[in-house]
Regions:
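Membrane-proximal soluble regions of multi-pass membrane proteins
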Residues: 1-27, 199-203, 209
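Interfacial loop-to-transmembrane junctions
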Residues: 148-149, 186-219
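Membrane-interfacial, low-structure loops and terminal tails that flank and connect transmembrane helices
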Residues: 16, 104-112, 191-201
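Helix-loop junctions at the membrane-solvent interface of multi-pass transporters
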Residues: 42-46, 96, 140, 187, ...
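Transmembrane helix-loop-helix
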Residues: 44-56
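Core segments of transmembrane alpha-helices
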Residues: 31-38, 83-90, 153, 157, ...
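Functional transmembrane core segments of multi-pass inner-membrane proteins
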Residues: 54, 60-185, 229-240
Length: 240
């Protein structure tokens, strides 16, 4: 059983399977480590003010997004259990814990309704906006530019982060993706011998967008919100 302990099992086995000696890819260790760090931070941050709703929501959102990063990077597919299931979970959590969207108290006692409304708005605006971006890009390039999984994933992000977090994730994900691809392209130019022909970047090659959307959503949820939200203050006049 000790070999199956998260993080420690990989270290005890020194990155190799005990039965055959084959190498265990470091990504499993990194996923476990990153998940553990996020959960530990959430426990520390939200138990201080006894906000158990935010603790549950933050751990759930982190688990979903880390799963998307790991799966989409390897398979270029985002399972519906992460995207659609995550959107449903985010909506339910927003209904029971409206503080997820900053709704603490309302004179009319409709905090839960407002929390659910913000979540639903995030789902519709996030997935709808990305759908039309993908549709227009598909027309322009005459090929599929975005997969349906990305559209559904942004609905999940919107359910947890609201419409502002969903909009930020589109553009933040694009920035993160461009930075990563630039660094990867630079590495391939500097050390071409260490880059396989299959992994080399080329114009028209499909790359997963889901991981960058997920990372941008996590960035917003776990710290960037207070810097991003003021940029949308002009929308308050429209009732959002």
């Amino acid at each position: 059983w000790s070999q199956n302990l998260p993080i420690l099992g990989w270290l005890f086995l020194k990155g190799r399977a005990k039965c055959c000696g084959n190498k265990i890819l470091p990504r499993y260790f990194l996923v476990e480590l990153f998940t553990g760090l996020i959960f530990a931070w959430a426990c520390y941050a939200f138990t201080q003010n006894q906000d158990l709703g935010m603790l549950l929501a933050s751990c759930s959102f982190a688990w979903l997004m880390i799963g998307v990063v790991a799966v989409d990077t390897e398979t270029m597919l985002i399972p519906d259990r992460f995207s659609l299931g995550g959107a449903c979970l985010g909506f339910v959590l927003s209904l029971y814990f409206p503080s997820l969207h900053g709704v603490i108290h309302h004179p009319m006692g409709i905090e839960k309704i407002l929390g659910a409304f913000q979540s639903l708005l995030g789902i519709l605006i996030g997935s709808g906006l990305l759908y039309w971006i993908g549709a227009l890009a598909g027309r322009a390039f005459r090929r599929e530019a975005l997969g349906e999984g990305d559209v559904k994933l942004l609905g999940c992000v919107g359910a947890f982060c609201g419409w502002k977090g969903a909009v930020f994730s589109i553009f933040g994900g694009a920035v993160f993706g461009c930075i990563f691809l630039f660094l990867l392209f630079l590495f391939q130019k500097i050390k071409p011998a260490q880059s396989s022909a299959q992994d080399n970047l080329a114009f028209g090659k499909e790359i997963p967008f889901g991981p960058y959307l997920a990372l941008a959503g996590m960035g917003y949820f776990f710290g960037l919100r207070e810097w991003i939200d003021p940029w949308f203050s002009w929308m308050h006049a429209l009732g959002f």
